[in-house]
Amino acid sequence: MSKVVETNHPLIQHKLTLMRDKNTGSKDFRELLTEIAMLMGYEITKDIPLKDVEIETPIQKTSSKVVAGKKLAIIPILRAGLGMVDGLVSLMPAAKVGHVGLYRDPETLKPVEYYCKLPQDIGERDIIVVDPMLATGGSAVAAIDLLKSKGAKSIKLANLVAAPEGIAEVQKYHDDVDIYVASVDERLNEHGYIIPGLGDAGDRLFGTK
């Protein structure tokens, strides 16, 4: 079974509270999302391998550690996932960025794919799939299905807020994918929205309805 890592850092929880507030506008919402994604990046990349290198400080030569050339890819689920990309890329500037376009049918709540553009060497990369919301889990499962069909082998999922139902759905179909969240919320309501959640992340991010 995959692990679920809830990042309870005080700064993340503070910024998430501001994002939940219905009076927070799109500009602040975007900035907070970028900041939280960057802070979550420290936990998500905790297991990246290191190697020793020889360097020379202003004082003397020494052995020190650098990331061991691991190839990374960040894959946002469009469109809300775009809001998490800049924060992670600021930590991992060499990472490639692909895109998976899915929307949730309002009647069936099932994901519908409309776009997919991935790095050609996707099978050689450690992948971080990002989406602020993990609600029913349908979009995340569909995105991971698609990535695996393209050869992806090492995948993590990063969300701001998740419903227990969404976590269970991802683990049901992809028990090899670890899930990183800022908060596991209470449940889904009858419309498939996370309670208490933060509303429609895409609409709040881009100022649309």
Swiss-Prot record:
GO MF annotation list: GTP binding; magnesium ion binding; uracil phosphoribosyltransferase activity
SUPFAM superfamilies in UniProt: PRTase-like
Associated pathway: Pyrimidine metabolism; UMP biosynthesis via salvage pathway; UMP from uracil: step 1/1
Biological processes annotated in GO: UMP salvage; uracil salvage
Cofactor(s) required for function per UniProt: Mg(2+)
Function: Catalyzes the conversion of uracil and 5-phospho-alpha-D-ribose 1-diphosphate (PRPP) to UMP and diphosphate.
Coiled coil regions, renumbered to chain: none
Keywords carried by this UniProt record: Allosteric enzyme, Glycosyltransferase, GTP-binding, Magnesium, Nucleotide-binding, Transferase
Protein's name according to its UniProt entry: Uracil phosphoribosyltransferase
Domain of life (superkingdom): Bacteria
PANTHER family for this protein: ADENINE PHOSPHORIBOSYLTRANSFERASE, URACIL PHOSPHORIBOSYLTRANSFERASE, CHLOROPLASTIC
Free-text comment on the cofactor: Binds 1 Mg(2+) ion per subunit. The magnesium is bound as Mg-PRPP.
Entry EC number(s): 2.4.2.9
Sequence positions that bind 5-phospho-alpha-D-ribose 1-diphosphate: R79, R104, D131, P132, M133, L134, A135, T136, G137, G138, S139, D200
Family: Belongs to the UPRTase family.
Ligand binding (uracil): I194, G199, D200, A201
